[in-house]
Amino acid sequence: MPLFSHRFTTASSSSPASPSYYNKPSSKTHKPNSSSSSYTSSRIHVAIIFFSLVSVFIGVAGTIFALSSTGPASVYRCGGSKDTSRVVSASRKLGGDGGNNGVVVERRKLLGFVGIQTGFDSGDRRTALRSTWFPSDPDSLLRLEQATGLAFRFVIGKSKDAKKMAELEKEIKEYRDFVLLDTEEEYIRLPYKTLAFFKAAFKLFEADYYVKADDDIYLRPDRLATLLANERLHSQTYIGCMKKGPVITDPKLKWYEKQGNLIGNEYFLHAYGPIYVLSAEIVASLAAARNGSLRMFNNEDVTIGSWMLAMDVHHEDNRALCDPHCSPKSIAVWDIPKCSGLCDPESRLKELHKTDMCSKSPTLPPDDIDQ
């Protein structure tokens, strides 16, 4: 509009080119030629209309070009993973490797995406979670996302068992709170599932942080959001309860590490597996990694820790992510060190939720609020 106004003002404030006899001194008074003046005025109006139409055309054409040429943010594809809680909006079809039927999805912007790792035999755990801290229906899921900036989904692979898949489909239709991964759901393949999770999460959500959590912990979403909202100097940050420990090389023991000879006698610093956080820059690197290019150890938490050693990441140790009891500062509660999660999650989740300290205490401790 300023462009049009400028041209109109310029045209109307300057006089039309005068015939030469207007400027010649004469003893006679000459009347302006009315037909010539009208003709000149008409030409000015035509010029104004022409330039206005051209400007409008250029503006519309530019808008159409921008909309057609600008796709969504770069997305790393990951098999056939999909988010069941929303209708995926697509802007462009790609011939590709199958994610969402070859469609690039629009990534939702978030503070954090939290993937609750679950399995086909964990239906009772999911029921217990939905009756405690995890939202029990799609509307509640959306309200929690709006309140905290965190999106929560159960994350599960696929099974060759048709009955298990049919039962899962029923649960999906009822709750719509899953991310489905295009990988086999097997305990011995947890490192592969974890990598598939981060790739899928990065494809579906544009988050500042990506959280891996197990389905047997009690979590305070509000406090997790507060933790993630803290300012950090490092763009590559790895947050969790950090630990070291002896490498288990005895095949008869639970945490046996087949490639222990590559590690030595003691594990490097890494986060406990029940919950940890990776910043967006780290996950972007994992999403871009070629399949088969990352070493996989037997244990998922060790595998992630080894990848972190290969990157220039900052290890942020936060014990509120592994609190054995609910406290004014606890974010995640689980039975450390007895179990890698709650020892009896179906019962313990409900017991903890009935405790005011777990479910009703303020997001911030009183001393922090006063400050």
Curated annotation (Swiss-Prot):
Its cofactor is Mn(2+). The chain crosses the membrane at residues 46-66. Pfam families: Galactosyl_T. The keyword Transmembrane applies. One of its GO terms (molecular function) is hexosyltransferase activity. Residues 1-36 are annotated as: Disordered. Pathway: Protein modification; protein glycosylation. Signal peptide: none annotated. It is found in: Golgi apparatus membrane. The keyword Manganese applies. Its main location: Golgi. PANTHER family: BETA-1,3-GALACTOSYLTRANSFERASE 12-RELATED, BETA-1,3-N-ACETYLGLUCOSAMINYLTRANSFERASE. This is Probable beta-1,3-galactosyltransferase 12. It comes from Arabidopsis thaliana (Mouse-ear cress).
